[in-house]
């Protein structure tokens, strides 16, 4: 992951971690929609902490898998 170059789009430079962030945000919103529709989200004691930990876990996994 550290060998990826900086991406330049329309004159703006983005670090490689920015694209991992976008992918993890997309997966996060998909997971939240699935959890809401399946009813599992009703069993969550503290939704804000659950959302934060879910996003952190997704971001960590994607960063270390090298997506």
From Swiss-Prot:
Key words, A-Z: Cell membrane, Membrane, Transmembrane, Transmembrane helix
TM regions (residue ranges): 10-30, 43-63
Pfam families found in the cross-reference section: DUF1656 (PF07869)
Cellular component GO terms held in the UniProt record: plasma membrane
Membrane topology: Multi-pass membrane protein
Entry's localization field: Cell membrane
Family assignment from sequence similarity: Belongs to the AaeX family.
Name of the featured protein: Protein AaeX
Organism lineage: Bacteria, Pseudomonadati, Pseudomonadota, Gammaproteobacteria, Enterobacterales
Gene name linked to the record: aaeX
């Amino acid at each position: 992951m550290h060998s990826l170059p900086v991406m330049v789009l329309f004159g703006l430079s983005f670090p490689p971690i920015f694209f991992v962030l976008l992918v993890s945000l997309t997966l996060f919103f998909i997971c939240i929609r699935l959890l809401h529709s399946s009813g599992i989200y009703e069993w969550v004691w503290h939704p804000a902490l659950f959302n934060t930990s879910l996003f952190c876990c997704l971001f960590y996994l994607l960063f270390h898998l090298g997506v």
